Amino acid sequence: VLLLLCGLSVTAEAQETQKSFKVEVSNTWNKAKADEPVVIKLSEINPQFRVRSAVVMNGSEEIPSQLDDLNGDLRPDELAFVIDLPAKSKKTVTVTLSSAKSDKTYPARVYAEMLVSDKRGKHVPVHSVTIPGTSNIYNQMHHHGPAFESELVAYRLYFDKKQTVDIYGKFNKGFEIKESQFYPTDEQLARGFGDDVLLVGGSCGLGALKGWDGKKSTHIEPVSTLTERIIACLLYTS
């Protein structure tokens, strides 16, 4: 549960403009929450300047955060972060939005990639792909669409009419997709790497938007276009 507290302030130093405000985050459960996602829509804050960076503070401790551009207009639409909350508790964090750019890096918690295979068999990284609904580049997309992972598990999303989520299970905590590319070698498997653990076929996999014809699920088709995009692409250091 989010609550924006009163007392917004705007400060300007040199050419940098800042806006600070407090956000109360509460956990009404009888159970603690780890890495609870918090999303703040910037349109509701109305900073009145172009936001290029943000800082979220829990007392004297900074919480890693990211600004997301959801519609591709090169302007952030939301601020997202995760926070640990004990059972039946509240925390108040201070958010500062700034017009200044930042080269700040945070420890990696996730990884995502989308690769297009060229004629020489090399995999070219891309952040967004849009094709007509009549086109099919399923086999030109390495691992058939975007792949993303936490330290615990990885997924891929098929870039075709199935739009199915597939799962890559892990034996050990850590990141593997950049190295294994969703297809671990025998040597990597011997080192304890995980692997694709689900035969998706024509099913919904872990979950997918499907139609229903009264008897069975159906793919959503035809469509005018297909788009897949990595919304937040940040530089991390570990």
Predicted regions and their residues:
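Bacterial Sec-dependent N-terminal signal peptides
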Residues: 1-18
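Residue-level recognition of short, structured coil/turn motifs
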Residues: 5, 59-60, 168
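Alpha-mannosidase-like glycoside hydrolase catalytic domains involved in N-glycan trimming
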Residues: 15-136, 142-145
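Short amphipathic beta-strand and strand-loop transition segments with alternating hydrophobic
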Residues: 64-71, 224-233
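Solvent-exposed N-terminal domain segments of exported/luminal and surface proteins
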Residues: 101-221
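Conserved small/polar residues in nucleotide/adenosyl-binding loops
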Residues: 236-237
